[in-house]
Amino acid sequence: MILLRLISWPYARKHLLRCLLTMAGIVLGVGVFVGMRTANKSVMAAFNQTIDRIAGAAQLQVTAGDAGFDEDILDKIRQIPEVQAAAPVIEATISTGQNNLLVLGVDMLGDRNIRNYDLEGSEDAIDDPLVFLAQPDSLMVTKKFAEERKLAVNSKLPMRTMQGDQVFTVRGIMKPGGLASAFGGDLAVMDIYAAQKMFGRGPKFDRIDIALQEGTSLDDATRKVQTLLGAGFQVEPPSSRGQQFESTSRMYALASNITSMFALFIGMFIIYNTFAIAVTERRSEIGILRALGATRGQIRTLFLAESAVSGLVGTAVGVAFGILLARAMAGYIGGLLTDIYGVAQTQGDLTLDPLLIGLAVAMGLATSLMAAVIPARSAAGVDPVKALQKGGFQSLGVGENRARRRWALAFGVGALVAFAFGSHGFVTYVGFVLAVLAAVLLSPAMAYWLARALRPIWARLRPVEGALAADSLIQSPRRTSGTIAALMLSLALVISLGGLARASYDSLAEWMRIALNPDFFVTTAESLSSRSFVFPGSLADGLRAIEGVDEVQPVRSVRVLVKDAPIMVIALDVAFVSRRIKLPAVEGNADEMYRLAAEEKGVIVSENFARLHDAHMGEVLEIPAPGSILRLPIVGVVNDFSDQQGTLLLNRGLFLRYWHDDSVNVFRVYITPGADAAQVRQRILTAFGSQQRLFVLTNREVRDFITRLTDQWFGLTNVQTAVAVLVAILGIVNALTVSITDRRRELGVLQAVGGLRNQIRHTIWLEAIAIGIIGVVLGLALGAVQLYYSVEIARRDLVGIGIAYSYPFQTALVLIPVILGAAFLASLGPAESAVRGSLIEALEYE
């Protein structure tokens, strides 16, 4: 403790900027880890909180997928003796221009046994449910929603419904708290039968909430309700909806977890690099302490204590930075999940997990200690005479090089074995880790070889400065090995993400070219993912009657539980659609599978469904419909990007018979050859736009929407590029600072014999650019290997679709000038420090 106060603290005050740079690695690694995980948890917590508050006193909920079920199910449930109350619900979200509004359609006669509506004042229209029912334009809103839009009781609120533009009247304002706080307070309640008309649901309910008699066993009640309703219905506690959403969004969660963990790994390497540099720089101080009688244990303890203090401070700042990052990311993630999965999200309060914070603190502290163990032990073990010498400690010993290469060879062989047996998921991850470890261990040797290769080039460009810069890297690889390794890892991550994005874009573009060929898509919302509103099937005849319309294909899409996961079922007229589009078969014969699907003898599944859920050709799938189970064999597998959990393509006739639902989500419209597209679009809007909620999206608008979602999905690539640049700047500044300190006498002698200040500057600049070049070369090479594993992991565990390997040369070409520019900028400060130092002190340094 005395050494820490007398030696470490004065050093930290003297080199405050350097200490801050050392802690920056901890801040970055911990911050990214905490930020990504907290943002994900906050989005899930907001969704679960909304479910819990909407559920009220409900202990069970009856659902049958997105399509809903007939009204007569309610009477059956109410006959069960264990059921105290059963209330039907329609739930949908609409855009209000500012944000999303969650609308609950409820039966006011029985719903108060489930939910409590705590209203401001006393409104007769609400106190008497019959009066509320008699006024179908009635609406209750939360106080938050009313205040934001300056609404009061009897205020009018226009909304676009499936009955056209309608004006609703605010009959009551709910006090804050409880139900009114669900969905961030953006909530409205209306009569369920008015909601059926508003959203085009017909005589159907989305779900039924059930409150049980006191003392009734939840498991017994679940079995009785399930037995009564039969197959095709899900009878579960309200919390299961959150589990289903978590299953739906698992791909994003897994992708973000992988990215954040790799970012943390890079941050850990920054920590190791910065602590190793700090210990190496002070080896003369270590020698003096040893000469004065300090034991090896005391030296080791001193530097471990320094690392622990730095780790704690850096971790604390990193946690704070992560919380700020989570606030920015939560809204982004919520919006992305809304657009992709069609489940509206609202940004609630951040959910801070004490276990996560504790884990982050433990990881930051443990990483700091582990990072300091090796250099501290190495410094403590050096002879005091050698510790006071310059330069020798920066070279790697023969034994150290051999050990590194032997371990790298072992890890490389392990990675090749994993490559050969890569059909197993766990083996792929092991191979990925071994390949990265092999690259890290080989990086000092490869950096040495590349520095030797650069020397003649640098000497030709600047005979004196270039040779000095290259010799500095060749003679002292220990000083820059950590910086180069961290830069290599960062760039490899950028390349792997960029390559994955490029391959995904190419596959997506090919799918859109084949599958999205209609001229127009007639939808109920401005995005294809919204399923709150549906059209009546009869609208197809009206669209066909429009002048210039050649063909209309109705499409219904609903999510149902297949293989314990919410899977998208797409119902359409397979015979008609297959004449316009034919997705190539991944498995099976294309003509045969479309024929069998049209004859209702089988189902076509997407490749990602087959991979993610272990389905295979000929397997009979059990698809739950209200009151029955539809059993169909898989007759073909195709590439389809319609849903990230997978899709099932079946004939519309089957859907009509099993779901008793003729509603439509989207009409695919083809115009006659030679017809004016703009005029046909306007005719559709003129004929139906005022009668119901209807949007006519062009082919280009739909493609742009899908491409924009993909851009958002791969937005993390930009974040990782920024991290890579930051890694380059931090690492190079540290490495050059130590280089200047270590070579102070050398640089002083150079100036004393006539060297110009500009020559010193050029030497430092060229050394920094050389570090950048070596890091870029190694990073682009490791990125090619890492991209292979990323493609395999994405194919097997994330998207489930075979993505072709495609090296992102464009990304690589952008990275080269960015990293070299960052390296040059990072060298400006250390270069000025080198030329402005005292010449007398430099010559007296030893």
Predicted regions and their residues:
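Interfacial "coupling" helices/loops that link adjacent transmembrane helices in transporter permeases
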Residues: 15, 245, 269-311, 391, ...
